[in-house]
Amino acid sequence: QEEMFRAVDEVAEVVDIKALLGNAPTELSGGQKQRVSMAGVLVDDVDILLFDEPLANLDPATGKRAIDLIDRICRERDKTVIIIEHRLEDALYRDVDRIVVIGDGRVVADMTPDELLASDILIQEGIREPLYVTALKHAGCQVAAKDHPQHIETMNLEPYQEKVRDWFEKVSLPEIQ
């Protein structure tokens, strides 16, 4: 029993829920419940962690913190992490090695985020691609994997500037009254 309490205390520290250990589940917010679930996954020291819809029912800010936490756990504990998630843009907030897209029960794609975002697979499968990728495509740009579209902050946008500028000048915006 002492070992169990030690393990709970340790993972509660990792996911920042130590102050909540005395609370009933009904007293916890959605984000706190997600962190409790993550703690449950961490209790057993396994090499591969599977998170099934870790962003479900979380607002975007809390979802971002959840992805930060998963990323931190992955780095600090040297774990392989598998995330099953429909909110792709939120999951891509941190670095991802590979994305597997499943459609109609079969693997449709298994590639790097850069390769996937440069393709039309997400659209074909009814998955919303990141908004900046959609905007570039609306501007007539052919997004290339070599420009690293996984993160807008680090993407090479130089090849797209002229087309985006031309598109912006052609788009008529409604008058603000």
Language model segments and positions:
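Conserved ABC ATPase signature
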Residues: 24-28, 32
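Catalytic Walker B motif of ABC-type/P-loop ATPase nucleotide-binding domains
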Residues: 49-52
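Conserved beta-strand-loop-alpha-helix hinge in the C-terminal portion
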Residues: 106-132
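Conserved ABC ATPase "signature" region
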Residues: 3-20
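Conserved H-loop
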Residues: 87-94
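Hydrophobic anchor residue at the start of the ABC signature
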Residues: 38, 84
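Helix N-cap at the start of a conserved alpha-helix in ABC-type nucleotide-binding domains
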Residues: 60-62
